[in-house]
Swiss-Prot record:
Region (Interaction with tRNA): 163-165
Native source organism of the sequence: Anaplasma phagocytophilum (strain HZ)
Gene3D superfamilies, A to Z: Adenine nucleotide alpha hydrolases-like domains, HUPs, Translation factors
Name of the coding gene: mnmA
Protein name: tRNA-specific 2-thiouridylase MnmA
EC id: 2.8.1.13
Length: 378
């Protein structure tokens, strides 16, 4: 198991005892195993945990980066004798992640704050801190593979397909990738737990984090407390234009939703679109959910080979848990937005990430635009 770790020459030309590794420790089993193994192999390990959101109600036991997680990370570091620091990023997290979360829902989108956190706090601010204190590299517990192919750094899906986290890293830059290592990429979760148990790491049996750290139970209540203006009543329209009822705020709905509409109708209705300009929830039959085209903003590209003018054939994932589908990707020379033509119809949720792959290699991705809004401004 341990031989499968991506640990060969974390920094080419430097021995472990000459190499300072800042390990991003969440307090969970994955990053703890990374930190302890590197420490035992002779690397100069510095554990670092981000303090993102202080609230007695924020940590449900299934979220990350709460006070209990900080305590767990510090306890692991103390047990094995390497330094650990807590990084207070609450202010930047509030501005970059929480406010974006609220604004996305108000714009009729369904956001993914964990990717925003990776994009800003973790792989921007934390890497800057690591360089400041003399770190040679940063290591994390993500289940992805970092490969160098013909001199080009690439991200590939993790060996454990059930835990692969490449979807959440599409917004990384190549400059960041030079500085980051993913030692667990060739392992499966079960083996990582066995390593943790073998090494007597105290969090070996700790459950995986699942919830959003600042949304303990009910995101609707969280939205209302963060920004009451996000909850504004409006009309529910059928796709044929008829008014079917009222809603209590478009932020309470997401594309594809069926439950909670409060409308009696001859056939099941689903949310097919959200119009933030008109404050309207648009519903229709399940067949109206299926899309074959979508547009992307903030398209990030991780390959030296750019998207050709005639388009690129690749596979895309529209949710972290969804299977890949074939598509043709192109990029507007005018505004840089991505255009994705799906080879088969899918349910598309604005605000989610469309992540692009060449088999198991991560090529890049972008944020799915709300086509109701985009069509008005395009």
């Amino acid at each position: 198991m341990i031989n499968n770790l991506q640990l060969d020459s974390l920094v080419p030309g430097k021995r472990p005892e000459e190499t300072t590794v800042v390990v991003a420790m969440s307090g969970g089993v994955d990053s703890s195993v990374v930190a302890v193994l590197l420490h035992k192999m002779g690397y100069k390990v510095i554990g670092a945990t981000m303090q993102l959101y202080s609230s007695p109600n924020a940590s449900s036991g299934k979220s990350c980066c709460g006070n209990a997680d900080i305590y767990d990370a510090k306890k692991v570091a103390a047990s094995f004798g390497f330094p650990h620091y807590v990084l207070n990023y609450e202010e930047v997290f509030r501005k970059e992640v929480i406010e974006d979360f609220v604004n996305s829902y108000k714009a009729g989108e369904t956001p993914i704050p964990c990717i925003k956190c990776n994009q800003t706090v973790k792989f921007r601010d934390m890497l800057k801190m690591a360089r400041t204190i003399g770190g040679d590299v940063v290591a994390t517990g993500h289940y992805v593979r970092r490969l160098e192919v013909e001199g080009e750094l690439q991200i590939w899906s993790g060996k454990d397909k059930n835990k692969d986290q490449s979807y959440f890293l599409f917004s990384m830059t190549l400059e960041q990738l030079k500085f980051v290592r993913f030692p667990l990429g060739n392992l499966v979760k079960g083996d990582v737990r066995k390593i943790a148990q073998y090494l007597n790491i105290e969090v070996a049996d700790k459950p995986d984090s699942q919830d959003i750290c600042f949304v303990p139970k009910n995101y609707k209540k969280t939205l209302a407390s963060l920004d009451p203006s996000a909850i504004k009543k409006g009309k529910i329209h059928h796709i044929d234009g008829s008014v079917l009822g009222e809603h209590d705020g478009i932020a309470n709905f997401t594309v594809g939703q069926r439950k909670g509409l409060g409308i009696a109708y001859p056939y099941p209705l689903y949310v097919v679109a959200l119009d933030p300009v008109k404050n309207t929830v648009i519903v229709g039959p399940s067949s109206s959910l299926v899309k074959t085209q979508l547009f992307l903003r903030d398209l990030n590209w991780l390959s030296k080979d750019q998207i050709p003018e005639h388009g690129l054939s690749a596979s895309v994932r529209l949710r972290s848990s969804s299977s890949a589908v074939q598509a043709t990707i192109s990029r507007s020379a005018k505004d840089g937005k991505g255009r994705v033509v799906l080879h088969e119809g899918c349910v598309v949720s604005p605000g989610q990430a469309c992540v692009i792959y060449d088999n198991e290699r991560l090529l890049g991705g972008g944020w799915i635009l709300n086509q109701v809004r985009y069509s008005e401004t395009a």
